[in-house]
Amino acid sequence: MKKNIHTMICITLCQFYFSCNLNVEPLIVGYWNVENLFDLIDDPEKNDDEFSIGGRKNVTEDIYKLKLTHTAEVLADLNADVVGLSEVENEFVIKDLIDNYSNRKYDYIHYDSPDERGIDNVLLYDQNKIDIISDRPISNNLPGGDKTRDVLYVQGKYRDEIIHIFVCHWPSRYGGVEKTAPKRAITAQLIVKEISSILSEDADAEIILLGDFNEEPNGINIESLKTIGLKSLMEPMIGKPKVGTYVYRGKDELVDQIIIHESLQDQNGLIIDPESLYILDLPKYRQQEGRYAHYPFRFWAGDQVLGGYSDHLAIRVAIIKK
């Protein structure tokens, strides 16, 4: 009897060890559109006047500090090891955020893009969790000289596995969804070209896209990514009541997405934990009353400071080594 008990304990401990080992230190990957994180200085090369001292919004140093404080609060709640950000003006605000406000010491990757509003994509990452191999901006050239943000590409290594990360902020729907869809189609084609090149060298490459796609998972341009084995993790959430990362004219939308290549679901190397997909939808991040109840609690409403966080909610998922 004593031998059987010892055997059972041994088996239980082994099962616990291997179960924990499978899930030890997952890589938490997130994304958030921070909504206009600008510094206070007027850059003559950018359309940032309204966010500068003396500009239309009457921004002060206290308002700037509040924006950074609230941005850091969301990042702390998200607690991602790697997080893509959109709508960040420049390197100055990134350094200010991570050096003086964040409770976690991130490093960052950023390139100035030609976007006419002066907003860029950024990747924050924990050097203790992922090694960066290479990074570069991918120019997103739209017809008619329309200036938009680059796609940020980063190649990293996690637990001896290569992972390809794309941080995206697809062209806006301003002017109408249908009218602006061709711009997003060009960006989708750019993504297809870049990823096809990666897959031509490694058919099992582990690829993840993080971004505000200004289109839902069942949108025509997101659907086009399926031709190269990409799939939005947000797809199962479509149509669920009160579920979304953004609200447009009272309708919840899933424009902020994590999109993966099928290789991250093949049970080899790195895999996505589907149960870990999470929208950071805490009560404090939504307006609780009034005409815009349930809308994300944004920082700006036109030229008025609401003092919230962003008009988008953050998202995250866990990646584990199989």
Please place each PLM-identified region on the residue numbering:
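Metal-dependent phosphoester/phosphodiester hydrolase catalytic core
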Residues: 158-189, 193
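Structured beta-strand-rich core segments of catalytic domains in phosphoester-bond hydrolases
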Residues: 82, 88-164, 168-171
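Active-site environment of divalent metal-dependent phosphoester hydrolases
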Residues: 90-92, 116-118, 173-175, 214-220, ...
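Active-site beta-strand/loop signature of hydrolases that rely on acidic residues for catalysis
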Residues: 32-34, 71-94, 124, 165, ...
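N-terminal, active-site-proximal structural segment of metallo-dependent hydrolase catalytic domains
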Residues: 18-105, 113-119, 189, 285-293, ...
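Bacterial Sec-dependent N-terminal signal peptides
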Residues: 1-25
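Metal-dependent phosphoester-hydrolase catalytic domains
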Residues: 196-207, 215-322
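Second-shell loop/turn segments in exported
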Residues: 56-62, 79-85, 110-111, 141, ...
